Amino acid sequence: MAEKMNVESFNLDHTKVKAPFVRLAGTKVGVHGDEIYKYDVRFKQPNKEHMEMPALHSLEHLMAELARNHTDKLVDISPMGCQTGFYVSFINHSDYDDALEIIATTLTDVLAATEVPACNEVQCGWAASHSLEGAKALAAEFLDKRDEWKNVFGE
């Protein structure tokens, strides 16, 4: 890689990581002292595999809605454009292990879901692009490898 770039993930050597993993990608402190903790929640191996858009889209809806049942510290869950994972951000919540637990509990909730929240043209910008079963399969696969989540580089 060349010079350091402004975007943290552009400075990550994607050939060195081993998905699945959850890593602290960065922190920001606001002018009033609030701290944002942004996690890279990587479901798929970069440049080798990716999530199909309907499944990813549904998983985003499900996680965004269901995670808020477990914490009031969630700021956002954002899908990565490369379709390999999500960014999950918390405010004033520095506990990595608890963040993992919130993610695990949320994905367990996904497995029990009977519908995708806000899967309609009024509440979603591409309501036709969803797959509940695909989202459940992604959640199950990620949960099955929970013992790997802390091992970003497969060491």
UniProtKB/Swiss-Prot annotation:
It is an enzyme of class 4 (lyase). Binds 1 Fe cation per subunit. It catalyses: S-(5-deoxy-D-ribos-5-yl)-L-homocysteine = (S)-4,5-dihydroxypentane-2,3-dione + L-homocysteine. Keywords: Autoinducer synthesis, Iron, Lyase, Metal-binding, Quorum sensing. One of its GO terms (biological process) is quorum sensing. Its EC number is 4.4.1.21. One of its GO terms (molecular function) is iron ion binding. It holds the Pfam family LuxS. InterPro entries: LuxS_sf, Metalloenz_LuxS/M16, S-ribosylhomocysteinase. Fe cation binds at residues 57, 61, 124. Its cofactor is Fe cation. Belongs to the LuxS family. Involved in the synthesis of autoinducer 2 (AI-2) which is secreted by bacteria and is used to communicate both the cell density and the metabolic potential of the environment. The regulation of gene expression in response to changes in cell density is called quorum sensing. Catalyzes the transformation of S-ribosylhomocysteine (RHC) to homocysteine (HC) and 4,5-dihydroxy-2,3-pentadione (DPD). HAMAP family: LuxS. Homodimer. This is S-ribosylhomocysteine lyase. It comes from Listeria monocytogenes serotype 4b (strain CLIP80459). The gene is luxS.
